[in-house]
Each structure stands twice: as C-alpha cells, then as structure tokens.
Amino acid sequence: MRNIILHQREERDRLLSLPYINRQTIYPVDVLLQSPMIKLITGPRRVGKSVFALLALKNTNFAYLNFDDNQLLTNWNEDVVMQTLNDVYPDFQYLLLDEVQNLPNWDLWVTTLYRRGYNLIITGSNARMLSQEMATVLTGRYIPIAMYPFSLPETLQWYDIDPTNIPTEKHAKVLSLQDDYLRLGGYPEIVKTRALAQSYLSTLYDSILLKDVAKRHKIRNTESLYNLAGYLLANFCNLITANDITTEFGLKSVTTTQKFLNYLHEPYLFFYLQRFNNKLKVMKKAARKVYVVDNGFVSTTAFNLSDNLGRLLENQVFIELIRKGYDTENTLFYYRSRNDKEVDFVTRKGVKVERLIQVCYDLTSEKTRRREIDALIEVAGELKCQTLQIISYQHKEIIEEKGFTIQVIPFMEWLHE
C-alpha cells in the first residue's frame, strides 16, 4: 500500500508542475478551503476536476488518493490506507479523494472521515451517484462545485488573451478562436490541440458510453445505447419524448426508454430541459429539449455544421446557464405560449420568472427577427416578465416595442454579465 500511495504522490506532484489556467467557479477557492464542509467537485470526464482540486490545494499540506487506480481498489484496507497516508503526508490539512465513486460503499467511508474531522475534497463523474448518495448521508454538510469543459473566456485565457480587455490587434484572432470554440467545444485537450478534436472526442464519447453507462448499468445491447445517443446528438436543441423514442427504436417500454435517458445524463453527457408550467404534473408530461455537454461531440458526427450554427450557439448558451448555477429541475426551463410561440430559456428565482432569453445566431433576416421578437413579447405578457434578451453571435442593439425593452447582446458580452 505504501508503494501505491507513494506512486500516487509522484503523479500528484507531476500534475502540479504542469501549466494550467485558473478555472471559473461560483465559489472563490479561498472561501471553499476555509469551510469545514465537504467540497464535492462533479462534472463529466476529462474537464479538469482533478486539476482544479490540485491547484486549489497547491499551497497547502494535503494528502491525495486516486480511485481510478485499480491497484488501490484491489488492495483496499481502510485502516492500512489511513495509516499510510499519515506516514506519507505527515500532519496533512486536507484530503483529496479523486473519483471516489469507484470505491464500493464510498459514501459510508466518507461519512466516517467527515465525522472524524477530516477536511475533504472529493471529485467524481457521476451525477446521480454523487448527488443522491451525498444528499442521503450528508445533507447540508457538503458544497457542490460543478465543472464543465472550458468556457470561451477560459479558452481565451489559455491563449494569453484577457477576455475582459481585448486589444484591437487581437480582434481577428479572438473571432477565429470563437468560431473554433462554437464548433469544436471546450474540452481542455482540444483547446490545447485543435487538430486532435475528431479522434480525441470520438474516443472520449466511446469511453463515456461504454464505461460510464454500459458497464456501470450492465447493458449488453450497446447497439441500442449507441443508437439512442446518436439520436439525441442529431436532435440536440430539439424536443424529444420518451414515447416517440420508444416507437422509433422499438424499445421494450417507455419506462425502459426513460431509464436509458437517465443513464445518459448521469455522466453529464446529455441534459433535458422541461417546459415551464406552474402545474407540476403538466410540466412533467410535456416534451423536453435535449442538450449536449459540449459542442465538440456534435462535430464528431456527420452533420453539416454550417446548417447548425444557431443550434450550436443555443446549446452553448444552455451550458453557460448551467455553469452559472441554474438547474433543469427548479430554475431553468423553455416555454411555449398559448399560440405555440417558443422562448428558448426561462430563468426563475424562487417563484418569480426572472428572465426570458432567445438565442439567435443571425438577426439580419427580417422574418427571423420578427419571429424572435414576437415570441418574446407574447411570452413576456403571459409570464409577466420585463427582462428580455436575445443572445446573438455578434449583433448588439436595444429594441423597444409594445411597452417592452429587448436587449440584443453578443454571446461574448453576455458571458461577462
């Protein structure tokens, strides 16, 4: 066990020596470290959860266990592990548990450590396991921190560009990076080397489906799983229903389909947005819109991306809203009016509708412009909301119509609101 933990310490120190950028989270790092509560860092594979935790702890005395290491799991003995940690990391202040969900009964062990007074930082890649089990055993004793692929500002930082102060001579470079980002996404490895996008994302996609879904849930018929995931990718930003999918793929039942949809959400691959309605039963029955965690996964399929720029922008806005702390159960929805006009995003604060957001890549067509404005105004009347936005790719203006003010704001500017 000592050799395993020493080897992991070497890996920890190697990772700490590499160049990184500081990631954006809704909590400042110093505030997180001062809290005795468990810091739970979640998100999809390969987005930098471990690196974020390591950087946060860089100037502290911390112990490290990586549960992606089969040797650690095979030789697991709780008492021996804790004794060895104390030998290898004398008087450590924090304990970082990386991908802890791989340890059987991890939640019980973490609970024990917490009650003994250890200051814990945990990372994991499974939404259901982590949120449900933590909520069950440690309600109110942990701080959730969600990590996603790089945002556009983080991508610019990687290229040594301050997104809040872009010099004139770098405008062309920034526009090029923004175009790349919209199509290829923000996975850290892809941001560093765009030429790897196709092969890297295809491999990562397979890994998520096979390891995080098929293996975890003992799914033998991986063809059905791949077909369903492919269908969701093809229909990103569109409405889906479990009934339609069941019929389309000849699945056993709507219950089976719903189960598969949930499995594909657990590793943060797909998200499902509900239609806003004050009646919960009506809301749960309505079709949902599907979004994917990173636009790069769309680029690994055979779609004609030039036809999808509007959807790619909408998908990215969705991810940014999630990154800002909105969630698809309580605070973020789409809406259709009584006349079937759709608004892409409705945000809610408490019981009050906070904001209506349309996403439109290009407003130069009068027909498109009219459609977006009319939908916003009609829905604003129904939901009694005065804060209206259209997020465009580059266009900016203020529209005054029928007593409403609509802010048209470029995507890059909206990110800094």
How would you describe each model-predicted region?
Residues 49:
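Conserved lysine of the Walker
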Residues 41:
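Hydrophobic anchor at the beta1->P-loop junction of P-loop NTPases
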Residues 1-32:
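A short, basic N-terminal segment
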Residues 2-14, 127, 133-239:
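Interdomain motor-coupling "hinge/lid" segment immediately C-terminal to the ATP-binding subdomain
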Residues 63-92:
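Short glycine-rich substrate-engagement loop in P-loop NTPases that contacts/grips substrate
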Residues 52, 56:
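Hydrophobic positions on the alpha1 helix immediately C-terminal to the Walker A/P-loop
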Residues 393-417:
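Domain-level recognition of nuclease-like catalytic cores that cleave nucleotide substrates
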Residues 195-353:
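Accessory nucleic acid-recognition modules appended to NTPase machines
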